[in-house]
Amino acid sequence: MKKVIAIILALAMMFCLAACGGSKEEKGTKIGVLQFAPHASLDNCTKGIMDALNEKGFVDGQDGCTIEFINGQGEGETNQLAAQNFVNKGFDIIIAIATPSAMPCYAAAKDAGIPVIFSAVSDPVGAGLVQSLEDPQTGATGTSDSLNYTAQLELIRAFQPEAKNIGILYTTSEANSLAQLKKYQELAGNYGFEIKAQGITDASEVASGIASLIASGIDCVCNLTDNNVVNNFSVVTAATDPAGIPCYGSEEEQVAQYGCVASETLDYVALGYQTGLMAVDVLGGADVKSMAVYIVSDSEPVYSTANMAKFGLSLPDAYKDAREVK
């Protein structure tokens, strides 16, 4: 009788082990998500990431799955500590949103063998996250938000036919901003523009930086996805609005919430969703080292009638079918 009971118990244990081994999340998958700062485009990335994870069965608190989200509040030290925290806890994967989060995550995780999936990184090669976009060959891959530079310059030219000087405010330590600035400098002349750029080191210099650009005689501001600037964009518009200088955003939320008149916008929810799918693939066994970076560059023109009115601008005929945001 004891032998029969032992056999039954053994079979029961085998059944339980088989049932618990069905998926990664059932084994207790730990996913760390680090967002650099609390601003709209990065919030949208996070939403897309969480949507993808949840749809694929990775839900915090269910089937042993843990998803720990940290917002770095735009502070470099906070992001570094969060990255190391994920590594110390032995997380299975780290998802990092924006270049200033991705870089410390990769630095902390690479020796531990923890894969990093980044989102909204404009220049992954320049940031040292991958060796190439097609074949990363590191412990990181993810999605890149390549701005549609030509479409943005065409939009600015259409809205302000007489404009000559475009002001760009950027953070000197943000690799994504340096890459974007370089592209605008290369292309601006094709549209009759000159780029006047002003670098800053941190958020405390946004006010003085935009003041310097206004003093230099700019006709408008073209905003990047620079995290310091976007996170403090009310400081920018507090100076440009009274000076009668329109701002053009790098994505929709900068038009809807921050006062920009128009933008060739990327869909950051969709970008985040693709990031989440890539993380799911890696958790399922895909090799992060050979997974190509996914680049999003398709854009859509959007505008705000209310913001345009502040500067006496009218909607150009070429943009009559553009989408209005309110």
Located regions from the model:
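Hinge/cleft segment of the Venus flytrap/periplasmic-binding protein
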Residues: 280-326
